[in-house]
């Protein structure tokens, strides 16, 4: 039975190549809304970055890749935007940045970093429920994540987002984020732990 298990911990480290095609950082990626729904908040411990929670994401990503896209967008059980298969999602509309509230998505470290960078640039980030059609008509959209970093979304469901390429605010946030994780942004140095 599962009531007398002893925890075991394993840590593995290996070189991690770019999660997305390096050109995707500049041109953006094509995304497909998944037929799979993000887990309901009461189905599992949605805030846990636990291996078992990722089968939903794996299925959604596989479906998107099979359709010729680079990533999936998952909706929650009520049809609102939740997140990507392994990333948080943001959109920009009329100079304001929006991202889904945390009900159905992981509270990502990179997500939090973008909140701080955006605020330091004078932009407001609003957390609220977002409909899929709001993403369709956004000026810009992008994913954030530890592996994905900051990657522009150029298209959702064969509809171009904004100009159909990386938007200017996404590019600015991306540039500062990349400078930060490479130790070139002194104002965010406390986020880093140098290793030799």
Could you describe each region identified by the protein language model?
Residues 1-196:
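Helix-start/capping segments and mature chain N-termini
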């Amino acid at each position: 039975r599962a009531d007398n298990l002893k925890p075991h911990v394993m840590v593995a480290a290996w070189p991690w190549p770019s999660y997305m095609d390096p050109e995707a950082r500049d041109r953006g990626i094509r995304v497909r809304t998944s037929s799979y729904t993000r887990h309901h908040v009461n189905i599992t411990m949605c805030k846990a970055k636990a291996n078992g929670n990722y089968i939903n994401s794996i299925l959604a990503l596989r479906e998107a890749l099979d359709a010729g896209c680079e990533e999936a967008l998952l909706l929650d059980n009520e049809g609102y935007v939740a997140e990507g298969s392994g990333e948080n999602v943001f959109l920009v509309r009329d100079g304001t940045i929006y991202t889904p509230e945390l009900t159905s998505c992981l509270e990502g470290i990179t997500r939090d970093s973008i909140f701080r960078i955006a605020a330091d640039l004078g932009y407001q980030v609003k957390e609220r429920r977002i409909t899929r059609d709001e993403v369709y008509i956004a000026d810009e959209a992008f994913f954030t994540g530890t592996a994905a970093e900051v990657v522009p979304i150029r298209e959702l469901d064969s509809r171009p987002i904004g100009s159909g390429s990386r938007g200017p605010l996404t590019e600015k946030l991306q540039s500062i984020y990349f400078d930060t994780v490479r130790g070139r942004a002194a104002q965010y140095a406390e986020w880093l732990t140098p290793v030799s």
